[in-house]
Amino acid sequence: MGKVYRHKPGAPDEYLGRVEPESGKVYRHCRGPDEYLGRGELDSGKIYRHRHGPDEYLGQVYLDNGEVYSHRFGPDRYVAKVKPNGRIYGHKPRAPDDYLGKVEGMHSLAEGGAAFFLLLLPVVERAEIEAGEG
């Protein structure tokens, strides 16, 4: 099981959830049963968010180099990099990439891509919005 942690400078990293290595399913840590968020296809690197009805395609991690691309409007955008050691870096144009967190016990780069889209990205985006309001 890949445990997903968000990096917090100067503090212990925050446990967000887990990625199942056999299925690529992602669960957010909650009180009581963990919440199923979506999945990463281990053979293709495609990431899907769980929805009622068809799942939503979010993007893909390339399994040969760990580059993560977001599928939004227009062409896919390079948004992150997953390293073989489980570390995940958010892409910043014309600046060093930000270290966002890690997947401990990662078996596939697809697990890291799923952790980025389904666990790390929502938390990072929410923190950026809150910082802008404060």
Residue ranges and their predicted role:
Residues 1-24, 30, 44, 51-134:
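Long terminal segments
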